[in-house]
């Protein structure tokens, strides 16, 4: 998943976003085929299903990664509560992500919080979760360090990291959040400005 696409984004909706695929990320999708799974498919977006929009912007050659959830009509309470849990995980990791904190410890904290929320089985992919919760971002979309299992990299001031906690519900869809942060002496400062709320149209 490293050094593949300079600019990128995908939109997936409902159960199609929750299908396993060859993706190295937490979401899958049917898309147009097995080699372009994280892409728009041919099904129409339905009411009351989550629409996940994951996209990258570039400013002066530096990338910023973010994900938002949209819906045509209100989502089920289960999905809304899971989305709120992912926001809480993101915000907690940003608060704890100070210089010297080891990336693997942040990953474990995210897993523990997902477990406490009753979402461990679906956290960061289903049926096989990916072993990370975030990644460096800069001139490339995916850079070091990785906030992942067994990663022992201490955070340093100035590192720029995308945190992306997500939950995959088979036959229902994907909810979660992603924002880009920069490590400061007191924690991670968020760079993206678009609201984290589910946007219901």
State where each predicted segment sits.
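Active-site neighborhoods and metal-handling regions in enzymes and metal-associated proteins
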Residues: 1-201
């Amino acid at each position: 998943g490293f050094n593949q696409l300079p600019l990128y984004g995908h939109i997936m909706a409902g159960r199609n976003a929750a299908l396993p695929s060859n993706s190295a990320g937490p979401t899958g999708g049917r898309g147009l085929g097995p080699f372009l799974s994280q892409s728009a498919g041919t099904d129409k977006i339905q009411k009351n299903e989550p629409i996940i929009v994951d996209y990258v912007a570039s400013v002066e050659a530096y990338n910023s990664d973010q994900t938002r959830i949209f819906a045509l009509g209100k989502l089920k309470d289960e999905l809304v509560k899971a989305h709120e849990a992912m926001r809480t995980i993101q915000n907690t990791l940003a608060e704890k992500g100070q210089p010297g904190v080891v990336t693997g410890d942040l990953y474990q904290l995210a897993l523990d919080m997902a477990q406490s929320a009753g979402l461990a089985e679906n956290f960061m992919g289903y049926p096989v979760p990916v072993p990370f919760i975030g990644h460096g971002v800069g001139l490339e979309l995916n850079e070091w360090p990785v906030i992942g299992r067994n990663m022992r990299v201490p955070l340093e001031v100035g590192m720029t990291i995308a945190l992306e906690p997500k939950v995959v519900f088979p036959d229902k869809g994907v909810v979660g959040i992603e924002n880009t942060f920069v490590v400061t002496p007191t924690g991670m400062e968020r760079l993206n400005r678009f609201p984290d709320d589910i946007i219901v149209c």
